[in-house]
Every structure is written in C-alpha cells, then in structure tokens.
Amino acid sequence: MSKYEENYKVTTCYKFKLKPTVIIQTEVKEWVHGNWDRVRTRQHENLKENATKGLLSKKAIQKLKGSINWLVASSQNKNLKSLKTNYIHKFKINFITLTIPPQENEIIEEKKFKLILNTWLTYQRKFSSLNNYVWKIEKHKDNRLHIHILTDTFIHHRLVRNSWNLILKRNGLLEYHNKKFNNYDPNSTDIHSIQKVKKVAAYMVKYMTKNNEVDNLYNGRVWSCSSKISSVMQQVLVVSPDKINEVLKPLMNKKIDYKEILTEPDQFGNSFLVAECYLLKLQDWILLKGSYLYEIFKELIIFLRSSKQLSIDFNLKLA
C-alpha cells in the first residue's frame, strides 16, 4: 500500500454481552489497509501477569458479581418439607462457609487447599446434584483460609459438615483438633438459606470482597464458579451492521437506562466511546419479550436450570 493512500476503519460487526442486569454493546472496527494501531491497552498489560497473587482485580470483581447475578437470576423457589415437623420451608439460595480448623504446626499451602476444595465440590456434584455455584476464598485474622460458597442447590447442613470433616480427616487436618477435643467433628461449616434475593448480588459481592487479600502464599484463583455459569458468561452475540437496528429497537424504552463507557481523556482532552450499556432490573427483561435478545436470555436461563445444551445461534447476520 502506498504511504499516501488513506487508511481508515470500518465497522465489521457489533458485539453484545448479556448479563441479568446489563446489556453491553461494543462496536468492532478494522483498518481497511491493515492495522496501524500500536497502542498497548491496559488489558493487554494485565494479561502478562498470570498469577492473581491472592487479590481480586477490578475486572475480577466485576466477573464475580456477574457470576452471582446469573446464579440469582436462574435460581428458582423450592419447597422443602421437614421430615420431623412436616413444615414446608421455602428455599432459593444457600450460603455455605467451609473452614479449616487451627493446625498445630502446618500452614495449608495452595496445592493442598485446592485439592481439598475440589474434592468437596466433586463429592457434592455426585451425591447432592450440586448445580450452579460460586466460591470465594478468604483469610481469617489468624491466617487460616476459609471458603464462601453460594449455590442454588439445597444441601442439608449435616451433610455439608460431615462431608467436609471427612475430607479434612483424610488429609490429616483434624489431628490437632482430635488431640485437643478427642473427636473428629469440629464445627467447621456454616450454612444459611437466602430467600430474599432482590439485592443479594450486590450484598454478596461486597461481603465476599471485603477482605481482598488472601495470602502471599496463595497465588492461585481466589474465586471461581461452576462450569455452566462460566459458559454462560463467555457467550457473546455477534450482530452484523445490517441487523443492528433490529436488535437495538426493543432497547429504546424509557424504562431501560442508558450509559456510555468512555476512555480517559487523552492529552488533547478527547475521550472515545468504548461501550454502550443498557441497564436493567431482572423484571425489565419482560419489556424485551419477543426480541432476539430476550430469546437468548431465556435460553441461557433454561440452560442454567436444566441439563439442556445451548442450541441458540449467537451470530446474527443479514438473511
């Protein structure tokens, strides 16, 4: 290409990231005569650092919040009957805390801690049909690690405690407790049912990130979620320029708030559009009923609630 030939960008497609409380739209542009853009973004710099160093970045906090929002949006009310009293209990979400009791001389390292956690999750997937969940690691004041787990699956409090203590015992982590109290049944778990979930995502993110630093010894992921939630969060709707008006039309509703995400001003004071956000409450999705966006959201919720596989086309092009 001649150095005098004009180079410019054209829009190739639009991408939509669907979340229960926001729809994020970005415009994808490419240079007509090749990419002259040499600017390193902050995101690219962050990708160089693989270890989390026991901390949650701003981006990780947003992902944690997103995973909790999907868990809340897809969870259904369940009726549980007590075998002792025949009383019907309402259930929607469980908040579980798993703790490792004090050790005499041992500090639990990352590798062993991961093994214990994964063993418990595998056990519950097999015997309790553990479905959707989000977990986050935190540190006690005495440097002991514990795990918070949010799940839409009911697990009896005694099964939670018995299974966790069994795994701890098999890994030699109850010997000090037995030496002091002559038993292998410490109060190492806590479980609460959350029925009022209107603001649970915001509350749980605040609660689960209040102690952001875990430990210099722990360089692994400090949070994660079930594979189905992870899969849903990775889905992106790709829309061709010819279809963009059709997709955007249902979002032009006064009840749906709109917000632009801009870059920080450059040396000339100019900011550039990065993304457009359409802010919703969960009940606002009914306003989009009949639209392609609504059908995708409904499909994602059904996927999280059942064993059904995703079958919807995420590439919307001109027919």
Task: List each model region and its residues.
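Right-hand nucleic-acid polymerase module
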Residues: 1-143, 154-319
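Calcium-binding loop positions in Ca2+-binding modules
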Residues: 146
